Structures are given as structure tokens and as C-alpha cells.
Amino acid sequence: MIDIRSPAPGRVLAVGLTQLIRRGLRGVWVRGDLPISAAVWAANHHSWWDGFVAAAVLRERQRPAALLMDGDTLNAFRFLRSVGVISAQRPRQALQALREGRVLVIFPEGELCSPGPLRRVAPGAGWLGRQAPAAVVPVAVRVISRGHQYPDAFVDISPEVAPADLPAALTSRLAELDAAIRREDPRLPVPGFRCAVRGRVSWDERITRWAGLIRR
């Protein structure tokens, strides 16, 4: 999603989707790097925000991208085609996106699930990686309310794995991400993550800043 080479209407929509992130979340925090070549971004899907978060991270890194979506859902939101969304029922189009060097965002659980451990992983992400060929990259994502007014999105990008190893690697990475979040004071940043997209400032953060200015 968010192909930087999209026509003008698509680019306008891409900017609007990034603003949605900035207004709805406290920020998007990232650990890890993607390969410089084409890649399958294979992530858990436990939040409404997941597709938007992936798009914002890839836009921030200036990576041309596409997102695989269920065909019925895409038919209901046809305008998303202009920002690189592809029907899951069109594998040739997905392969073409990878062969053009894009990052293809896919949620191999196949549906939006409640937050928790990874569910069953369908083989599609690995198949696309083998056929393109392209790197298969497990990406753990967690959107969570911590110690501030607005939720934080954490994106933990793993090194490339063999397609057959994707389920185990993504399961492990998601568990590691959840453990890292639990270990840290909810009011403090999680070590090792950088802010890729800054969003809303909580009232408590504003009050702290004002108090600091008054004391000067």
C-alpha cells in the first residue's frame, strides 16, 4: 500500500492516510530494517490499524509498496486500488508487484484476529516469496494503549527467513515484542525502537511541558 509512483489522486490519498495515523495514534515505533530488494512483509493482523501502520512505515522509508486484501473487501473500497492495494484473488498481480521491486504487505492469518498469539499462518506469503522470488520478512505489529492518552504502534521487522520458517519466526518475533512491551514502564519508550511517524501528544505530556516552561 502507498506506492510512491502512484498517479496524483493516489498520492493525495496516501498523504491523507498518513494523516490518519498522525491524528489517531501517539506514534509508530520501528525496530529492524527491510532488505533493499523486493520483499514480502508478512505480519500478524490483530488491529484495525495494521494496514495503515505498514503503509506509513513504508512511505517514511520511501519504499514502493502494495498490500494484499480480500477481493470482496477491496470491491467495497475500490478507491484503495489507487494506492497499491491488490486483490488476494489476483496472485499474478501480486507477483508482478514483487518483480517490480515493491514491498508486498500481506497478513497470512487471513483475517483480523483479536490481540494475542499468532493464529494459523496460511502458505500464501511463502508461496509468493518463492515464486517471485522475493525475501520473506516476518513483521510483528502491536497497536496498544500504554501510559498515554493515545495508542502506540510497534513494528518489529525480523531478518529474512526461508518461506517454510515463516510461521515459527513470526510467532517468536511477536512473543518477543509483547515481552519487550511488558518489561518497560508504560510511560517510557521501549528500548531499541525509533519513532518513524510521530502522532498525537497526550494531555499529560502537554501539561508536563507547560509545567517545565513555568518553572524556568
Language model: regions and residue ranges:
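Non-catalytic C-terminal accessory region of glycerolipid acyltransferases
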Residues: 2-5, 9, 37, 90-216
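Helix-to-loop junction immediately C-terminal to a conserved catalytic motif
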Residues: 9-45
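Residue-level marker for well-ordered alpha-helical positions
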Residues: 14-15, 52, 74, 91-92, ...
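Catalytic cores of transferase enzymes with a strong primary signal for eukaryotic protein kinases
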Residues: 17-19, 54, 67-69, 103, ...
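An acidic- and aromatic-residue-enriched active-site/binding cleft used to recognize and process polar
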Residues: 20, 72, 141-142
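Glycine-rich, highly charged phosphate/nucleotide-binding loops
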Residues: 24-28, 84-93
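Residue-level signal for beta-strand positions within conserved beta-sheet cores that form or flank
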Residues: 26, 63, 151-153
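Catalytic core of membrane glycerolipid acyltransferases/transacylases, capturing the structured
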Residues: 33-89
